[in-house]
Each structure stands twice: as C-alpha cells, then as structure tokens.
Amino acid sequence: MSNKKVIKLIKLQIPGGKANPAPPIGPALGAAGVNIMGFCKEFNAATQDRPGDLLPVVITVYSDKTFTFITKQPPVSSLIKKALNLESGSKIPNRNKVGKLTQEQVTAIAEQKMKDMDVVLLESAKRMVEGTARSMGIDVE
C-alpha cells in the first residue's frame, strides 16, 4: 500500500447495508473514478449487521483507482434519537423539550462513540454528548 498515492478522501454518511449507486454515493465516487458497484457491495457486506444506522464512512481513493474505506460509529445525534425513540430533535431547542436523557444513557452513548471522538477521558465524552442533547432540545438529568 505504501507505493500507492492517495488522490482523494471522500467522507459520506450512509445507512448501514443500504449503499446504492444513487446520489450522493454515485456522483461522489464516479468523480473520483472508483468502481461504484464494487464499493456498494463491499460496504453493504461490511455493514449488514448494522441495518438502518447512519454510518460515517471515509473512503480513501488511490492513484490506480482502488479504494479502502473506514466506517465509524453513528453520529451522537443519531444515537440519542435511537436511545429515546425520537424521529427528530426540537425545532426550538431552548423552549420546546422533546425528551429526557438519563446519565446511564449518556454514559452508554459516550462509551460507544469515544473511539471516534478526540478525547481521552470518559467525562469529556459525556460532556460532548450532553451538549449535543441540549442542542437537540433534550434535557439531561
């Protein structure tokens, strides 16, 4: 791999197991000259155990048009919505509260997301989760 030159990094958010050549995936990969169906098949195979989760993926495209990709944990907002069974956050987060997140839920989300965050301490990750929850109109106990 060291002799291949990286020509592009593509960052997308794709539902697990549901990659297809339609926008936004097709145009982003097509512009880089990547085999779109090859990526879709590999991504779907790698994420078939996480259906429906919105997964950030970083695709590295090399000069010979090959690629590698790394999937990350879902965004904190998606994890919060999943924990509280919400469709979306509040449209007016300072006035309308749409749910309440317990400290146990905050800790579980922070532990799950910690490897993708640039933090060392669990407390720092918990504060980031709490901030995201507040910006979505969710109270934190």
UniProtKB/Swiss-Prot annotation:
SUPFAM superfamilies (UniProt xref): Ribosomal L11/L12e N-terminal domain, Ribosomal protein L11, C-terminal domain
Keywords: Methylation, Ribonucleoprotein, Ribosomal protein, RNA-binding, rRNA-binding
GO MF entry, a single one: large ribosomal subunit rRNA binding
InterPro entries tied to this protein: Ribosomal_uL11, Ribosomal_uL11_bac-typ, Ribosomal_uL11_C, Ribosomal_uL11_C_sf, Ribosomal_uL11_CS, Ribosomal_uL11_N, Ribosomal_uL11_N_sf
Domain of life (superkingdom): Bacteria
Post-translational events: One or more lysine residues are methylated.
Membrane-spanning intervals of the chain: none
GO BP terms: translation
CDD domains noted in UniProt: Ribosomal_L11 (cd00349)
GO cellular component: cytosolic large ribosomal subunit
Short name of any one Pfam family annotated for the protein: Ribosomal_L11_N
Function: Forms part of the ribosomal stalk which helps the ribosome interact with GTP-bound translation factors.
Family: Belongs to the universal ribosomal protein uL11 family.
SUBUNIT field: Part of the ribosomal stalk of the 50S ribosomal subunit. Interacts with L10 and the large rRNA to form the base of the stalk. L10 forms an elongated spine to which L12 dimers bind in a sequential fashion forming a multimeric L10(L12)X complex.
Record protein name field: Large ribosomal subunit protein uL11
Source organism: Chlamydia felis (strain Fe/C-56) (Chlamydophila felis)
